[in-house]
From Swiss-Prot:
It is found in: Membrane. It comes from Caenorhabditis elegans. It comes from the Eukaryota. It is a multi-pass membrane protein. GO terms for cellular component: membrane. Keywords: Membrane, Transmembrane, Transmembrane helix. Its main location: membrane. This is Uncharacterized protein F46C5.7. The chain crosses the membrane at residues 35-55, 57-77, 94-114, 131-151.
Amino acid sequence: MSTTRMISDNERRFVDYLNSSFMPFWRRTAFVYKCELAFSILILFCAFAELIFYDCFVIFFLMIIASFVFVLLYLEFYFGSVYNCPALLHLHTLSAAFMSMVCWLSVLIPIFFGESIYIASRYVAHVIYKYYGCQVIFGSLLTTFAAASFARRKEIKSVELSHVDYLKRLMKLTSKVAEDVQKEAKSFELELLDIHSYS
């Protein structure tokens, strides 16, 4: 009797489910990279609005950088999800998490050091308030996107490990069956037939 554990129908169905989970990935992950692309376009429009209506070059420059960052994150998450590339998703997670930390520190450090904007002029206070608001919004969004790419990467890794485990057990099973067939052929003393003798 074979000592190799047979692959059950439930396991086959599970692997089929994991295979099919790759098919509709754009339905489950499209929301994330579409949001990144939409935010990059929205931030770009807001940047030009700041330049045209408020003539504020500081906020305009920061928003242009933020728009470019969201475009890069969009490309990383899009290609990482479409081609099931854990390396790109890992890069997306690290990039988004690092930039989120920078955004939050740029807001929290001035507060912890007790810098006050009440002594500033109205124009400077307006710029600082917008700067703080943008950093808080960007930090929150980047944290969310980092969590999404991390979850997607874990999902791909689990599918890959399931495939490897399934293939290993399948190879063990087929090798054991081949050994059993060879033993039975020897026990019955089966001989190869010469097909040319029938011509």
